[in-house]
Amino acid sequence: EAGQADEVVRILQSAGVIMLGEQATVIDGVGFAGAKGFIGGFGRGELGAFGEDAIKVFVDEARNEARLLENALRSLRTERAVAVLHYAPIPETVEGEPLEIYPFLGSSRLAHAIDRFDNVKAVVHGHAHRGAYSGHTPGGVPVFNVAQFVVEPAFGRPYALLEI
């Protein structure tokens, strides 16, 4: 934060946190694939690569983040995997946010990448601080918005426990 991202990463890694940025890891037989994800909207409202170059660059970033997630998931050889994102892959977990900002909260491209893999048993994301706790990808994978402002009111604590 505040231009100190590298320092934050260094501190977290020195404390034993595994940074998933565009890669995967396995803990106790469960695979975790991470990507930031990106924005662009959901379903029929998803922004397409047309018109001005700036829009095409924007859409390319959303496509690239979905590819990074897909590659991280593909690298896992586990029966159970969790996709870890910042941005939402479905509109259901951003419900509660103003409709006008939905396109800036996530992208369906992420859900399409997730649904390519049968071993993905859950997805977690943040970013939508006023969103809903849970939903499913079109392929049926459970999605959880674990933003603190969503989780704490739901559970009375600033974290959720998921059984994978």
Task: Give residue spans per PLM region.
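Metal-dependent catalytic neighborhoods of phosphoester/phosphodiester hydrolases
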Residues: 1-15, 94-98, 131-139
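Active-site-adjacent helix-turn-beta-strand microarchitecture at beta-sheet edges
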Residues: 9-12, 17-30
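Binuclear metal-dependent phosphoesterase catalytic core
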Residues: 26, 108-121, 129-164
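Active-site-proximal beta-strand elements of phosphoester/diester hydrolases
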Residues: 29-41, 82-86, 142-148
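Structural motif
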Residues: 30-31, 80-82, 122, 153
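Binuclear metal-dependent hydrolase catalytic cores centered on His/Asp/Glu-rich metal-binding motifs
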Residues: 30-78, 103-108
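Active-site-proximal segments of metal-dependent phosphoesterases and phosphodiesterases across multiple
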Residues: 48-50, 76-119
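Histidine-centered divalent metal-coordination motifs
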Residues: 86, 127-129
